Every structure is written in structure tokens, then in C-alpha cells.
Amino acid sequence: MTPLIFVTGGVVSSLGKGIAAASLASILEARGLKVTMMKLDPYINVDPGTMSPFQHGEVYVTDDGAETDLDLGHYERYVRTRLSRKNSVTTGRIYENVIRKERRGDYLGATVQVIPHITDEIRRCIDEATAGFDVALIEIGGTVGDIESLPFLEAIRQVRTERGAEKAMFMHLTLVPYIAAAGELKTKPTQHSVKELRSIGIQPDVLLCRSEQAVPDSERRKIALFTNVSERAVISCPDIDVLYGMPLELLRQGLDELVIVQFKLRDKVAAADLSEWAAVVDAVKHPLDEVTIAVVGKYVDHQDAYKSVAEALRHGGLRQRTKVNLKWLEAQDLERSDMAALQDIDGILVPGGFGDRGFEGKVQTSKFAREHKVPYFGICYGMQAAVVDYARHVADLDAANSTENDRQSPHPVIGLITEWRTATGEVEKRDEKSDLGGTMRLGLQEQRLKPGTLARELYGKDVVAERHRHRYEFNNRYRTQLEDAGLVISGKSMDDTLVEVVELPRDTHPWFLACQAHPEFLSTPRDGHPLFIGFVRAAREKKAGGKLLKEARA
């Protein structure tokens, strides 16, 4: 039976439960434990796949094609375990499962209720996702006191009652606000948050106190007294300059030891080696170079919509001790501009998106980068924009477009994928009338790279696998025509049916590459991703006015 750490949040949302949980997980992993993580989200959507990026932020995709909460991106950036559909569960999915069972007659005519049927299904999902691991951390979305979270809190209360403290731990993240006028940290919100938890039968074992500054020992003692939590289990989580330094901070305060002692794991663990995280923090704090990258997107007012892209760019810089400054530009604004915003930029990245709003701005951005020899990296919709640009302005295919935006285009160089093969070898089909949810080409897919190309050089191997999330694809009818016009197709699906990567010859452009997949989902601060590392290096070379003499390594 896997020991479980349940992480809840109080007072306000967005305190950083995911980062705190992932940081603890990284320490436990460094001590030799096999760790997994899970997110329980209280919203009624089955998954976030059809939710607006402005409301929910990024949709993070796992190897098996699950469309999940962006917190799973945090988890995978901090731990080595690759997550799956099992690790992201919503209220909508729980109810969908229960209703399906009721329709099948699995409940034998019983009245289906929140307790026990909904809570039992939550517990079943927890058991399924965490089996076979030494420790599992489970984040409960939302804030204690929200009506939506109650079934999840009841379910984890039942787990603790049945398994005991040696197999289930409650960790509560709460706000300790600093009142500048009084010059004091206030503990009352934390006391009330714990009181709310205790009213539903949950007594926290550990408190993580988020604040602008370190919580002094006197306040920690006060919090411990009023919340019935051991003083050594009241952990200070102040604001820090580098989020990737959180594992080092939590290790310093001994949070991992609390887990080891409560779960009696002493015989399984070694000393924690966080040298990789120390190197990451050092590279962030002491860069040797600096570049500015323009990110031309549709949802730039809500930058969480591109969370993994932003992090992957920074990871690419970390690997060469380079600070990456991001300049966020709204694609729609560029449609009516002279592209002055792209002057003095070291590199341009156009990320994914859906719909026609801002697409012409992305096409014009590709054209600008191509003509002005600015390093260009297109991802998903950014690749499609690059293909449309090349078709219109180089291959002379007037009015070329994607059928997503213009179904009457005389040259639909980007079209709907009607059939493709999944990672398991099964054939999936869809058409214009298919549901939006869960009908895309999703998950990890292999592709073969063309020898002698930039993509092949960056990856360093012939076959690679990347995660996908898209409905539209390069139209194969235009392959020959665009290749004859000079476009290089450097990556294709293993069955040669889908174009995965396009680029420009290096004798015509220093660095112009676009891919249909989402490589940002496989980038981590400790390893980076070859495409992002190569892109940042190209930006450095543009800034330096030529080839770099030597590589700086983190």
C-alpha cells in the first residue's frame, strides 16, 4: 500500500501548492524513493481540453494523450516520473465514471449518492494512480471551504481513517500575510483555515506557511500552538527569487525528514543529493549571456497559457548559462503594425493556438523572421503559420491558408487530419462534425528525421518522440510543390503520412525551424530540450553577430 501525502490549500488560491508538492517530491526522489504525483481538480469539466486558455491557462499533454491541468507540467519538471491520464482527475470525470457504472447496473439498484459512491470512485482513482510507488503526493485543487472540493476532502479523510498516519499524511499550504502598516505577519488566516479543515475531520500533520518573508520562530510557535501541529512541522515558505530553488529550501528545513519519520521509510532512503538543483539555481543567478526572445501568441494577456513554452525557453538558456528575457506580443496587434515591435529581437517563437484570430499576425511574423534572417521557432500553429507564409510568399500560392480559417481557400496547405495512427497502432478517424473534446491527435508520437538537416543535428538521432495536440496538419498534396520551392521537410511520422518538422536550408537562413509537436512538454530545468537549446544558441549567435567561439555550459 503506497504511503500518500495529501496537499491542500487554504485562505486563497494560487499560493503554489503544485510547486511546493513537486519540490518535496524531488527531494524524496533524490533520496532514492520512487515517487509519483497526482492532481484532483474540483471543476466539472471532464478535462481542461476544451477550456479557454484565458480562464484555465495551459493544457498540458502527457505521453498517453491526456489533456491535463498545467500543474502536471510542474510535476514533470521537478520529478523524473512520466505521468499519465491516471494522474489527473476532475469532478467531471468522477461523475462520468459513476454515472456510467450506474447505467450498467453496477450498483445493483442502489440510490447513487456522494457518499459512498462518489467518494469510493475518488479513492479508486487514487489507488489506481499510486500503486507500485514508494510515495505519492496528491494535490487537491481549490481552497479549503470551497463547496466543490468537499467530496475530495471527505474521500481523503476516509483514506486517513482506514490507513492510519503511517500511510497517509496531510500537508496544508496556507497564507501568512504581511501587513506593511503594522510591520507584522498575521497568523489568524492560517488558524481559521486549519479550523475549517478540522471541522470536516482533517488534522494537518504539516503546515507550509506562504509569506513574503521568512516566518520567524516566534510566529511558528504561535501557529503550532493554535493549530495542534508540531512546531518542527510548521515550515516557512517565503517568496524566493528562483522557484527551482524551492527543493533546496525545503530540504534545509527538514520537510523530507518529517515524511521519512512518519512513514517509517528510513531503511529505504539515502542522503539527498540536490547538486543538480543547486547547479540550476547557480545558472539562473549567474548568467554569462543574455538574449531577448519575442513570443508572438494569441493569449499573451494570460501568460499561464504558455507556461511550458516560457519555462522551456528558460531551460534552453540554463544549459548555456544564458538569461532569456521574454517579450510577449499579441499576434492580432501585429496584423495592423509595421513589425517595429520585432526590431532588435534576438529570436522569435510562435507557439500553438486555435482559431483564426491572430493567425495573419503569426503569418506576417514568420515572413518577417524569414526575410530578416531572425532565428524563428514555430510550434504547432506556429509551424502552420510558417507553411502558409512560405506557400504564399515563396511558392506563389496566392491565398494559401489553413482550412481551419478558410475552408474555401484555393490552396489549403494546412488541412484537417481525417485519419492517423495512435501510439498503440490503432487507426483513429474524425471529421468536421466530431466533438471538440478528446478528438485531436494527442500524446507521444515517433517521427523520423532527415539526415543532414538542422533538426537531425539538434536531436542527434534519427528517430525521436514528441507529444502532440492538434487537429490540423500539413496537406500532403503540397509536399512536392513546397519542397521544389525550397522548403525542407526534415521530420515525418514513421509511416511517412504526416509532416512533423519543416525548416529552411541553412545557406538561406541561419536558423528557421518549425515543428507540429509540442517539444515544450518534454523540457526540464535539469536537462533542457535540444530544440530550445539550439534556438537559444541561435539567438545568442545573432546577437553576437556570428558563430560563438565556445559553448558555456550550466
Swiss-Prot record:
GO cellular-component term (any): cytosol
Species assigned in the record: Xanthomonas oryzae pv. oryzae (strain KACC10331 / KXO85)
GO molecular function, one term: metal ion binding
Residues that, per the record, bind L-glutamine: G353, Y381, G382, M383, Q384, E404, R471
EC number from the UniProt entry: 6.3.4.2
Known regulation of activity: Allosterically activated by GTP, when glutamine is the substrate; GTP has no effect on the reaction when ammonia is the substrate. The allosteric effector GTP functions by stabilizing the protein conformation that binds the tetrahedral intermediate(s) formed during glutamine hydrolysis. Inhibited by the product CTP, via allosteric rather than competitive inhibition.
Protein name: CTP synthase
Record's function text: Catalyzes the ATP-dependent amination of UTP to CTP with either L-glutamine or ammonia as the source of nitrogen. Regulates intracellular CTP levels through interactions with the four ribonucleotide triphosphates.
Record lineage: Bacteria, Pseudomonadati, Pseudomonadota, Gammaproteobacteria, Lysobacterales
Pathway: Pyrimidine metabolism; CTP biosynthesis via de novo pathway; CTP from UDP: step 2/2
